[in-house]
């Protein structure tokens, strides 16, 4: 027996007109957002802070965390992430031309390209023969970024100083189910900003002592060196890192960067 169906109260055309009105509203709001970004660009140009990079990873992370939290069950976290990353990437490109430098070997990975595309949208990718060449280029162009695979051959180039003042400003993926460690590191000159949920990436020659105050969030080997992501926005000159450096000089600890922790969502 068929279940009786009640005739729809409204026509499909009426419902679709409502979708069209909502889309018009979204479009107007996007245009308004881009106009406000132009004022941010002018402000940064006026204070000289565009000279380094228009990208503010801390602010970007706070926007995403707030909206994903506010969306709750009404809008999937992944949709929020994709929409606002597309908006933020375009907003950044409106402020300055940005390129992402990487080695040919790194860009040959479709998975790496996909992670970069979903985070940086249409930002241009510039291919180099090696990680060292990509890091050297970002050192010379502070508004640009460099991307490397966590398990790629970048650490020696970094230790040899090829990245200049560039630091790790973020890791990808930025959203997802808890994973043991990220896949990509992003280098740049954006000023690190504390967001309340941050990590500090350190490179050491050997394991951190077992009794060290902080439990690493993840660790990875890179060549003979040890990479550890520590919870918090830490400074080399303050506790607990300063004590670690003093009592364990042979670790040759260097801070690679400080950045907002990725967003963990249940799969
Ligand atoms: C608009 C800004 O510039 C960039 C774009 C952002 C955005 O689209 O919201 C946020 C931070 C910056 O990476 C800003 O600094 O506020």
Question: What is the predicted role of each segment?
Answer:
Residues 1-267:
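Domain-level signature for soluble enzymes in the chorismate/prephenate branch of the shikimate pathway
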